[in-house]
């Protein structure tokens, strides 16, 4: 069993690396700008060129993934599943951890499962509450039991206790508790582990009606299906029409990032709501209960347990979720910042991979290098690129002032041209976002279409 790393400080040096790289880059950019600006200019040109190439590379993959997405939407996957012998052996265990959500949100998630094209008698649905939210949980539990009585093969409710040693209160620890409880039911029903898929969803997840059928089809046709997690396309579209413009831009950005990753499964981790084999979840001892980003860690747990023989298979169908919201514009921005900070919490995974990879000599070194580089490069550019390009990029020219250096004199024009090329990504994202928009709700005015267009000026 891999060591749990949620209790920070055990591997302090490796925990410091993301911060050292980020702040070291900023200090280096400021220092060279003040004392040797021509060096800073060269660095900025190289970095901007790298960013432009990355944008173009990103657009190629997003375009390819979008075509696959559109083609997948055209297929009736339940009809395809029925062509496979013994397809009814596949069960879905849907895990919905909750904390403080309204009855409406949970009801919509269950309703989406009930209205999927996959047979309801092949669903085991688990709604997990927290002891700290017990009163709210018990109130909606009675209503949900009444509304969905007899709908699924089994609907169960669990209550995750507070204060379990080694845990932090969060989605991961609740998922671990829920898995343990449904494990007892699965054993009692004598359902073979290899016939079960687990859908670990955020509670606001509205799965596409064909998602579970498509997933079952993949599970029945993929090579070594028990050695793969399954990643859908995440659309933060449930409330996209009422979210603030910065939140909408960020939400679409996350969707396009994941869309580009789907066509490169060799570098993928799982993200947010996704699915996995029950056998894998049991083999690794469920989700780790003491960290923030359990959604991606569970993939690495499987990768380590199976000595690198574990992957992510893309599912080119969407699951719809809520974009972050607040009562005011600034509250929404604060919630967005906290969400992005949680996703970018690279200090959890880097020390974990470095320490665990050393314990697994059977994993090919090329795979270890790939995951380490992709993770570190992704976290690094995420934190540094916006500030380097749009803020510190101007500093060396301001310090240099009027100069006879041809490099410094001509660099702004070169950088301007590169940024103009990079804006292709913005225009492409803006155009593509309209294909992912849900129908305009009745309470939203028509002029909001104009805001949907103008927001990309941000």
Language-model segment annotations:
Residues 3-21, 89-106, 363-387, 454-458:
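Loop-to-transmembrane boundary segments
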Residues 1-83:
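N-terminal membrane-anchoring/stem segments of glycan-assembly enzymes
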Residues 1-3, 119-131, 407-420:
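Long, acidic, intrinsically disordered low-complexity segments
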Residues 26-55, 375-458:
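Membrane-embedded multi-pass helical conduit in multi-pass membrane proteins
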Residues 56-76, 106, 265, 288-293, ...:
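Juxtamembrane/interface segments at transmembrane-helix termini
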Residues 64-75, 190, 352-359, 395:
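Structured alpha-helical bundle/scaffold domains in large eukaryotic membrane-trafficking regulators
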Residues 230, 314-316, 320-322, 327-406:
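Long, K/E/R/D-enriched contiguous segments that form extended
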Residues 70-348:
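Internal catalytic domains of large membrane-associated glycosyltransferases
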